[in-house]
Amino acid sequence: MILRDYQSRSVADLFAWWTKHQDNADIPLLVLPTGSGKSVICAEIVRQMWEQWPEYRPRTVVLVPSKELAEQNAGKLQALLPDNIHVGYVSASLGKKQHHADVIVATIGSIHKSAHLLGDIKVVIIDEAHLVSPKGSDSGMYRTFLDKLGQICQFRTVGMTATPFRGNQVWLTDGDEPLFTGIASNVTMRELLDQKFLAPLVPPNARIETRIDASQVGISNGDYKVGELSAVVDSYLQQVAIEATRIASERMKWIAFTPSVDNAESLADKLCKLGI
């Protein structure tokens, strides 16, 4: 697999960061827009470690929030790594607990209490790093896992995200005892658009009439509470689908952002019933 220039640069930037910052508590971010191929970059990080330092057996844990991302990351890892490097899962949703694999792709909900079963780990890669609690005093799943693993082995950590700041505009590297201490590499949306790796969004010419009232939705850690927001959005989806069909029926491809998977599936179903 031939990497794009920015993908190779991101990997090189990470290794340069780790070389400069020797303390395991120095944890960088790779800022990578949606569509940049985070799973490819993740796989290349692991591939280079096994190629350069096989004598250290650089076993790696890739933390993801969902089984879908677990399967996506594992697929890229299996495509890039030699057959003798075993890629396994720890995911209740997939029915697999392969704690002794060379590279473990794990859903955080399934592994956060299982650090003691992993043995010697050299690297932890956190996908969707903005999901990590912003408070050092908060014993969330990610911090619990890292703390427990740190009691049995020494390892380096990196986070990957498309959004290096939270809904309250506070950067992931700022605030009360942030987990992440700096940005090792930053790929911009403009760079991907200019190189035509991403297509620009085309907004509708017609006025959008639907306005979702989220004034009663609660706020947590500077962002909307997803469950409450999803419930509110659900009541608007039929109206949204009808309006979208009216103003964008001539477009070949659409993209819709919803607060939850349930919202997305419901909207897709409504669009299908409208002939989209």
Please place each PLM-identified region on the residue numbering:
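Conserved pre-motif I regulatory segment
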Residues: M1-V31
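Walker A/P-loop
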Residues: D23-I45, I255-F257
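Conserved Walker A/P-loop ATP-binding site and its immediately adjacent core
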Residues: S39-I41, Y56-A79, S260-D262
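Inter-Walker segment of RecA-like/P-loop motor cores
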Residues: Q78-H116
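Post-DEXD/H (motif II) to motif III coupling segment of the RecA-like Helicase ATP-binding lobe
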Residues: L131-P203
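Conserved interdomain linker/interface between the two RecA-like ATPase lobes of SF2 helicase motors
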Residues: T181-T258
